[in-house]
Amino acid sequence: MTKSWADGLPVRVEAVDAQGVPSAFGWQGQAHAVERLLQRWEVETDWWAEEGSARRSYVALITRTGLLCVLFFDFGTTEWRIARVYD
């Protein structure tokens, strides 16, 4: 069953490559090495609002253990979070 979290759950990114894509991250007490990047995109919402916008950089990837997931970097909080995990 696919699980998703609109605001994401915290992950610990241990390393990023030259393009800023995670090459390893920690989640739920386990280390995950990234096998392959599938897709990358950016989203900016509410750019017109006085209180500011939310800007995120998303990556869909597969880990070496076969976990298919979507992570995002939140430019406002400077944190990496996991948004979705596919079964």
What is the predicted role of each segment?
Residues M1-D87:
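Non-catalytic peripheral regions of nucleotide-handling enzymes
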